[in-house]
Amino acid sequence: MAFRIASSPFTHNQQRTQRIMLLVILACLPGMLAQVYFFGYGNLIQVGLASATALIAEGVTLSLRKFAVRTTLADNSALLTAVLLGISLPPLAPWWMVVMATVFAIIIAKQLYGGLGQNPFNPAMIGYVVLLISFPVQMTSWLPPVPLQTIPVGFHDALVIIFTGHTPDGYTMQQLMHNVDGISQATPLDTFKTSLRSGQTPQSILQQPMFAQSLSGIGWQWVNIGFLIGGLFLLMRGTIRWHIPVSFLLSLMFCASLSWVIAPEKFAPPMLHLLSGATMLGAFFIATDPVTASTTNRGRLIFGALIGLLVWLIRTYGGYPDGVAFAVLLANITVPLIDYYTKPRAYGHRR
């Protein structure tokens, strides 16, 4: 009888990179379906466009670097970056913005640092921030949720306006953004901040049609609940750990609740922070990126809490309506320092 001699390790682990990436993409589906239901097919088209661009950009870059293209693309990391980017962008953002952000995320933020596992910053958020700084008007132009739309936008309408700038009937993005009251639509966070700075009270702001069914804005609470469900799925599968999402959400809720209790006439209610914008997407899918996040348990708690604090500060005092992307990138800068001071004590050594 012949015996096969194999070298260690002899343990088996199903958590391969390819499988992890696919699980994260699968976990995004509940939030994506909520986006489609309340805001139309735009984000679905953006995800498809970003995915095609990401695979082409990664393939070309790998070929230039003399890497095995097919093997490397099979890890699905480029696909996940594209999905997260497509989810984050406004549904009807022009096609060239999607391509530009994806190329920047894959080539500049990932491959120029050495590829998967070498990048210090989250590639999807780098691409998003490049667009937000360069094209702030387009990046804050969101469709009203379906119940408030005066001009219904179907799949064909969304596809045409993304590539041409207007629907087949000749409607522009600015016309589509007006809700049933004739008011130009923005995200709930943007609307609340702008209205508050114009002198309105929180009570009067929350009487607007956007907030009629929920403090977090029509549709937005279900989008966030969808990503929460996906995040819990990842936790149960052991794909991510609880430290970053929990500390992120607790830190954000603590800051929002404390400020709201002290001065409710000046600050947004906690539920608006919790279930609006990219809160759950950021907590479970973006901040938990194992490459750019802290690697120790104590470090993860600090990292998540720092992001929650930064999100609240940017949303409250910053010039942009949602601060998740900036908060994650700023926290990425601190990861080496956090890991240095939270590294566990080696056995047999005092420190």
Swiss-Prot record:
Subcellular location: Cell inner membrane
InterPro entries to which the protein is assigned, alphabetical: NqrB/RnfD, RnfD_bac
Superkingdom of source: Bacteria
EC assignment: 7.-.-.-
Coiled coil location: none
Assembly: The complex is composed of six subunits: RnfA, RnfB, RnfC, RnfD, RnfE and RnfG.
Protein name as catalogued: Ion-translocating oxidoreductase complex subunit D
